[in-house]
Amino acid sequence: RHTQNSADTDRYGAETGPGLNAEIAKQTLPCYGISLGDITYSEGSRNSTPSMEIIRGHFSRVNMPIFNVMGNHDYTYYNTNASIDTSPESSTINLVSQRSFENVFGPINFSFDRGNVHFVCMKNIYFESTPQSKWNAGDYEGGFTDAEYQWLVQDLEKTPKTMKVVLCVHIPISTSNGPNISKVKNLLKSFTNSIVFSGHTHYQRTVYEGNRLYEQIHAAVCGQWWWSRIEGDGCPNGYTIHYFKDTDIKDAYFIGVNEGMNIRDYQMRIYKGNLRTGGKYAYFQQSHGENEYLINVFNGDEKWKIKVYENGVYAGQPTWIPTNKYTFNTGSSGQTHTIPSSSSQDWWAIGYHIGVCKRGTSGSSYQTNNYHMWKWTAIDPTAKIKVEAEDPYGNVYTCEDVVTDGLNYPDYIKSPLTIF
């Protein structure tokens, strides 16, 4: 996802594709892939849509069929000061600007069945579609046009209520209030255990809406726009594998694509709570105590069970840190920012991208939120810590490695093209 130039597409071909094929080779069931949008990185007057054909070539070398959802950066954008020329065949801005995607990847709204699961892939980037209006790449929200909603109604009318419905979109619907979002949710809730697969955010998160609908927001294989091999929330650049049996997901796990993070057991990272992270462009000082630990469980949510052992003896359960995004103005180069203990973010990952790579030194796009951070206060400050994390499917993962030096970043998280 998010390929803008040849360096980006080369990394997809060198890292993501082989990583996918290595994992596919381990499977005993037929595999299918869904790309959740932002395959390219078009914005404003910058068009990256020509790279779609290059990425399609890389997709063709992945050993499974890949279905594609359109993202907000997959439009053909024009200069924001130029009018959009429409035609009878493409009478709105939306239609004009989605043609490049359709020409390479096919329809933007479609569905298919696999067993007793009905997959629906839809575009849910909503722009004001006034012909001849001025185009602004940022003037969108998560939503569906009336025509798209009616298409979904007709599609689901043909689907038995006994089937599981998986709606695949780009922008998360659990955090969107755009046109027809609530209607789409109600449609999905008329089926048992519907699920939404989405992307867009560059972080991993699960959102439960009662017992009839939940959303899995997937991290990006490009991480922080290919500047490293980790996401802004600390997850590896990676993807999630879901195993379906009849109408249930019987197992699922997140996995990275790069060596050092491409094994199933790599599901978390532990930090000392008082780390100083970053580099010469910005430093970040955590405010937790010396005997406190932060535990980032990459795919963790409220249904995970986290346990801590000290010197091999069960010591208790850590406390989930309520989601809280701390933002700041970067200030002068090399400045140290004190991070409040209420922040749930992964400042080891943020520190690398901002402080070492000098990315996101203005704005907050690199100050990524985190929804899966826990805190543990050691009973014995000298004890050896082990964390055990059990997912909702009964899989148990353990970690004993603790990051104690926040300024020493391992090579396996670094981009091969931007070694700092």
Language-model-derived ranges and their functions:
Residues 1-47, 418-419:
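N-terminal active-site segment of His-dependent metallophosphoesterases
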Residues 327-376:
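Aromatic sugar-binding surface patches on proteins
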Residues 36, 40, 156-175:
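Short acidic, glycine-rich surface-loop motifs adjacent to enzyme active sites
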